[in-house]
């Protein structure tokens, strides 16, 4: 059965796609610590609202999710790796997700 891209994106996030914080690349672990500390962040777009237009994350009101850049060694720009966290308090998010492919797939970060 063929599925449209929106349905496929929504189906990509599954419980088995969780990843332990210790399994993330060192750069992502560092960004996760900075998120919890409230910064400082390297990129001006870090902490910007993530719109979840791809609908790959659970649906929440606009402004719930914020995105942070995870440095990609050798990349001249921000690269594809991000951490997206959601919650009322940016320093104490309800959940964080890691993407290594610029929002195509996400892995929920677990302790």
How would you name each of these model-derived features?
Residues 1-7:
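C-terminal segment of classical bacterial N-terminal signal peptides
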Residues 7-58:
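N-terminal secretory signal peptides
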Residues 39-111:
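Functional cores of ribonucleases/endoribonucleases
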């Amino acid at each position: 059965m063929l599925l449209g891209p929106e349905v496929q994106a929504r189906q990509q996030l599954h419980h088995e796609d969780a990843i332990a914080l210790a399994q993330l690349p060192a750069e992502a672990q560092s960004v996760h610590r900075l998120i919890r500390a409230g910064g400082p962040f390297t990129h001006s777009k870090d902490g910007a609202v993530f719109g979840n237009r791809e609908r790959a994350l659970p649906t929440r009101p606009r402004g719930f999710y914020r995105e942070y850049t995870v440095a990609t060694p050798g990349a001249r720009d921000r690269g594809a790796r991000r951490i997206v966290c959601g919650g009322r308090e940016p320093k104490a998010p309800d959940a964080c997700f890691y993407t290594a492919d610029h929002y195509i797939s996400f892995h929920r970060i677990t302790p």
